[in-house]
UniProtKB/Swiss-Prot annotation:
Interacts with coenzyme Q. Its main location: mitochondrion. The keyword Cytoplasm does not apply. One of its GO terms (biological process) is cellular respiration. This is Coenzyme Q-binding protein COQ10 homolog B, mitochondrial.
Length: 240
């Protein structure tokens, strides 16, 4: 009898010393809370439920969206050409255009204009142009063929990669000696993409004002232009 009692006592002691089964513990925990997992070795409760904000997140975050934005490339090179009959002689228009030291008095946005050097058929000029927020000086080499051609090419400056203006004067209408055919062209490329975009918006208006300014200058120096019959007038414009 004593022996049986001792065996039962030892069995109870042994069963009390056995570690609890992890799987049994997890099963009991799952039974009470399916969304909670108990890790027996470290005593941590892990919640299986997703955080509220996790359900509203997209499955795939488009981190590359910014780099996929495509904007149309702006052509930085702008070109404009114009042909027209003007009621002034070739010599008169040549004198107006070649008198670059006077540009500051009548050319829109021209703040300063100086002749740096001069020799037969050529001169070197420096112009300062300004219209908010741009204020820039640049130097040009000017080719002169009296009374037919005035061609100016920018040789330096931080504003332009390329700038060239060409004025050509040829005989006008038969029977109207105080007329000439004007061929004007300008091509330029800004260094700055921002300036190129602005030029795209205002380019046509700026060029028209420039050409009109030279006509007004001729009117101031030589009086009213020759009256040309409407049916004989010519005015062609091309730009890119």
């Amino acid at each position: 009898m004593a022996a049986r009692t001792s065996q039962r006592t030892l069995a109870r002691v042994a069963s009390g010393c056995r570690p609890k089964s992890t799987t049994v513990t997890e099963a009991r925990v799952r039974g009470s809370a399916r969304n909670v997992r108990y890790l027996a070795p470290c005593g941590i409760l892990m919640n299986r439920t997703l955080a509220p904000w996790a359900s509203v997140l997209p499955k795939e975050i488009c981190a590359r969206t910014f780099f996929r934005i495509t904007t149309p490339l702006v052509n930085k090179r702008k070109e404009y050409s114009e042909r027209r009959i003007i009621g002034y002689s070739m010599q008169e228009m040549y004198d107006v255009v070649s008198g670059m030291e006077d540009y500051k008095h009548f050319v829109p946005w021209c703040k300063k204009s100086d002749i740096l050097s001069r020799r037969s058929g050529y001169c070197k000029t420096r112009l300062e142009i300004g219209f908010p927020p741009v204020l820039e000086r640049y130097t040009s080499i000017v080719t002169l063929v009296k009374p037919h051609l005035v061609k100016a090419s920018c040789t330096d400056g931080k504003l332009f990669n390329h700038l060239e203006t060409v004025w050509r004067f040829s005989p006008g209408l038969p029977g109207y000696p105080r007329t000439c055919t004007l061929d004007f062209s300008i091509s330029f490329e800004f260094r700055s993409l921002l300036h190129s975009q602005l030029a795209t918006l205002f380019f046509d208006e700026v060029v028209k004002q420039m050409v009109a300014a030279f006509e007004r200058r001729a009117c101031k120096l030589y009086g009213p232009e020759t009256n040309i019959p409407r049916e004989l007038m010519l005015h062609e414009i091309h730009h890119t």
